[in-house]
Amino acid sequence: MILEKNNIIHPNDLKIINDLIIDKKISFVFQNNSVPIFKKKDFYFEHCIIERKEKINDKDRYKSIHCQNFLRVFSHVFSKFKIKEAEIYRAAINLTVNNSAKKCPIHYDHNYEHKQILIYLNDSDKNAKTVILNKKNKKLKEITPKKNKGILFDYLPHYHYFPKTGYRLVMVITFKEKEK
């Protein structure tokens, strides 16, 4: 399953997020490689909102001082995708730039079943696409970044191209949908 929705974040919340980023109230941390298990030197910058479930105990997972703003955004985004309740495994804003790498390696965000939502927070280089593959690494969908577009997909391998110009801002939410 792969679903796309435009205008996924409420305009007021999108303005709050953009203001936080533009006014430098959100810090980004240098990450040496986009997919740690590959040790490829394709750096990016990350603002961690909720740390990976497998990395740290539950009480210390909320990393962003703006977490409450983001939790409200997540709730709205989940409702747009008709997700009633979810356990979030990780949430972050990834900032990628031209780093001399063409693309990140094919990967899953976790080594266990999860769903994933990507939200483009800016109109970046149109060639900085996200590519979602099937379990045999055959292309299922190629998504062009567009500000405020959200993509929901199942536990599938994927990768993205790094922008050649400008920067690419993507909010990443991995989660498990709770039983109804």
Regions inferred by a protein language model and the residue ranges of each:
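Non-heme Fe(II)/2-oxoglutarate
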Residues: 1-86
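Catalytic core of non-heme Fe(II) oxygenases with the double-stranded beta-helix
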Residues: 61-180
